[in-house]
A protein has these predicted regions:
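Soluble C-terminal extramembrane regulatory/interaction domains of multi-pass membrane proteins
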Residues: 49-63, 69-165
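Internal, Lys/Arg-enriched amphipathic helical interaction segments that engage polyanionic partners
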Residues: 7-9
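Short, small-residue-biased leader/transition segments that mark boundaries at the very start
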Residues: 1-5
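Non-transmembrane accessory domains of multi-pass membrane transporters/channels
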Residues: 11-62
């Protein structure tokens, strides 16, 4: 983690907007802590598990951005809007839960939160996949080159659909 921190700090120092980017990452870290805290306090088992799964995905995305600070600008909406909004929504869910409110409006709000958590997790995963697309394309290009070299040397190498050779 020390090398990641040094790399990120150096990257920020070299950019005119580095201070803003650093502040954005610090805010994202606070938002993730708020989401994690709220998720830990949710008593409904399924909602708790879904909120924790969302937190884990958010953490992976955040860690990826720390390791690849050059991609932070590509994740602005995730960092600025989604993390903050999810933190506030889960915080309100916990507030209603802890207050023991059972009005139809509160139950409907909680139902909507339960319904949206898996969708948010999918969205976070898609964001991470998009950020990692260039690495995936590079690896696929490397595999094509390697396959071509193996074929020219007389080896038949082609991956099947299930990944076996």
């Amino acid at each position: 983690l020390g090398d990641v921190y040094k790399r990120q700090t150096l990257y920020f120092a070299q950019r005119p907007d580095g201070g803003e980017m650093q502040a954005l990452m610090e805010e994202a870290e606070r938002d993730l802590k708020a989401i994690r805290s709220a998720a830990g306090r949710i008593t409904d088992v399924r909602t708790h598990e879904d909120a924790l799964a969302l937190t884990e995905t958010g953490d992976r995305l955040y860690c990826y951005l720390r390791e690849h600070p050059e991609k932070i600008s590509s994740a602005n909406r995730f960092l600025i809007y989604y993390l903050d909004t999810v933190g506030r929504i889960l915080g309100q869910y916990v507030n209603f839960q802890d207050a023991g409110l059972g009005t139809s409006e509160v139950r409907e709000f909680q139902r909507k939160v339960r319904a949206i958590l898996p969708k948010l997790k999918t969205g976070f995963e898609e964001q991470l996949s998009q950020l990692m697309a260039s690495e995936r394309f590079d690896a696929e290009a490397d595999m094509k080159v390697m396959e071509g070299l193996l074929n020219t040397e007389g080896f038949q190498w082609e991956a099947n659909q299930n990944g076996s050779v």
